[in-house]
């Protein structure tokens, strides 16, 4: 048992140290690897990232080639993964350098978004369930504990189940601000060459990749410094049937037990396209 605690302590310290050695924002421009593949894996990067944002608890790397801008995101914390499965990650790019959620020239893309009935299944199978998940069958019905239809003991095979469930149910990307594409839901199997890749690895870590063709980003060219925003949406922004907020009573007052899921967290950064060497 003593050895087990030593191993666990080492893993916690290693993870914390890794995050602490990274900058809060990416500081350099990067050419995307020639073998980049949006499959929900970070193997082409050697699982190394350029920054770690403490507010969102997101590791990330931004890169580009002559055709696309790429975002590669890694999330380790189970509760943060649950938040993402509930409401998605929104990535916003502004080619004029604004850091304003309401800027009219923002381009934003949100993924994943899916029917809520699939979220508890994915969260449980991935190992991201940290406490009871309440679900509702509809208005006027009493919320009940989610009971998985499978043995939820963590295992490599269940992580595969989580990835398969995610791919089977997260079928659209929410688009806003691209002149050539109407605002709204775009199929992940689109002809506009906007590509997403997402998966859970064998430890339950979530990897999300996004490719945006530069032609949709309105004039971003080499040496142009632009701004980006990575946002973990609040569940309250995407309310769907079946969602339930749990409450605790503190000093006689009702307090949400899911403030982390019901709060938006985000950060802004700046990036310049990397030129071909």
What feature does the model see in each segment?
Residues 37-44:
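Acidic, glycine-anchored loop motifs typical of Ca2+
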Residues 49-166, 232-240:
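Surface-exposed, glycine/proline- and aromatic-rich loop segments on solvent-exposed faces
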Residues 1-26:
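Bacterial Sec-dependent N-terminal signal peptides
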Residues 165-207:
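Short helix-loop boundary/capping segments
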Residues 18-33, 269-277:
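Sec-dependent signal peptide cleavage junction
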Residues 221-277:
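Long, compositionally biased interface segments
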Residues 40, 68-75, 206-214:
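Short, well-ordered beta-strand segments enriched in hydrophobic/aromatic residues
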Residues 49-50, 58-61, 194-200, 258-260:
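Beta-strand-rich interaction surfaces with strong enrichment in secreted/lumenal proteins
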């Amino acid at each position: 048992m003593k050895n087990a605690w030593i191993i666990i302590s080492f893993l916690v310290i290693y993870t914390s140290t890794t995050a602490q050695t990274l900058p809060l924002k990416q500081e350099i421009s990067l050419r995307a690897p020639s073998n980049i593949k949006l499959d929900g894996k970070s193997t082409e990067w050697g699982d190394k990232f350029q920054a770690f944002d403490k507010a969102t608890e997101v590791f990330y790397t931004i890169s580009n080639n002559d055709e696309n801008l790429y975002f590669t995101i890694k999330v380790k914390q189970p509760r943060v993964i649950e938040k993402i499965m509930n409401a998605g990650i929104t990535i916003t790019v502004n080619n004029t350098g604004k850091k304003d959620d309401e800027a009219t020239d923002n381009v934003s893309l949100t993924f994943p978004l899916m029917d809520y009935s699939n979220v508890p299944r994915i969260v449980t199978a991935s190992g991201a369930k940290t406490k009871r998940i309440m679900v509702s069958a509809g208005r006027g019905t009493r919320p009940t504990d989610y009971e998985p239809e499978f043995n939820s003991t963590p295992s490599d095979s269940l992580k595969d189940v989580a990835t398969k469930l995610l791919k089977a149910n997260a079928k659209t990307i929410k688009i806003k601000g691209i002149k050539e594409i109407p605002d709204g839901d775009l199929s992940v199997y689109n002809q506009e060459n906007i590509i997403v890749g997402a998966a859970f690895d064998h430890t339950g870590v979530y990897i999300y990749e996004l490719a945006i063709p530069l032609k949709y980003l309105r004039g971003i060219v080499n040496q142009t410094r632009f701004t980006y925003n990575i946002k973990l949406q609040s569940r309250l922004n995407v309310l769907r049937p079946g969602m339930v907020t749990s409450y605790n009573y503190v000093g006689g007052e009702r307090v949400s037990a899911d403030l982390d899921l019901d709060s938006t967290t985000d950060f802004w950064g700046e990036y310049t396209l990397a030129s071909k060497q």
